[in-house]
Amino acid sequence: MLTKKIRKLPLALRAKIFPEGRNYVPSLKTPVSNFLVHTKRHCNGGRTVDAGLWLKKHCDKGGKIFFAMAGAGSSFEIGVSLSEMIRAGKIGAISVTGANLEESLYRYLSNKDYAYIPHYDELTRQEEKTFDRVGLRRITTTFLPEEETVRKVLNHFLKLWREAEKTGKYLLWHEYFFELFRRKLVKPGRPEDVKNCWLYQAWLHNIPIFVPGVEDSTMGNIFGYFSYDGVHPFLKKYKQKNPISVNVIGHSFRYMHRLAEWYMDNTKKKGLAFLELGGGISGDFPICVVPHLKKDYLDGHSIKIQEK
């Protein structure tokens, strides 16, 4: 009966409706996928599984994923899975916040020094103050070893920034992190941390990275301090005698230019899958470059040409 009613619809509307069930053949090699396809059929769960099945087909055909990550994914060891995706050739490019970028490096340096507190939501105010007094820094369930990470690499960054200042050249934010690996200035805390550091794997496999909003990170804050050259009556008392030039960092418009070029060079033959974890600028930035290409560079051209 339902099929007869559907046939009465206009073709365009009929094309939006699918019979229940998926064209999926279970495999002994994919027990998790088998379970999800069998149990998650409707609403958000069903849409998520459908997206995953589409993404697998896309990658099986040689397509790449543009991976955008917000929040504290690197602090929570997203590198374990993202690094594997990079090595498998699934990732085309990555857009991340400044905090996610540096946290991947910190996991590389001192993963063994992180600590876990599962019931953080039950902490009292006094307990939180006690953590702060002894120097513990926490993001929800995870304590971050600042002394073993940030302070360990700070002098390397200061030297790189001063070096760029002398030569009159700039690097994009992530390229300074890549320099640490290229020059072998840092070593992993443990051998297995190399495998699980997505930043290191991205450098190793020449994966382009885009970092909008680099200021929102610990090292970004530190650079803001060392480059401050203002005259505020309070802040000027604490500024450096010789502030680092802000021009040693390629600002976000440089990232925008590079991403526009990357899109043009990497979407000619095959489509690009967009996978976003979390909200905010890490996902908004790579998305906004698409209409930027259409409406700014191709302003005045037909919609057909813009879409092409």
Q: Which residues does each PLM region occupy?
A:
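Metallocofactor- and cofactor-centric catalytic cores in central/energy metabolism, strongly enriched
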Residues: L2-V153, K159-E163, T167-Y170, F181-L277, ...
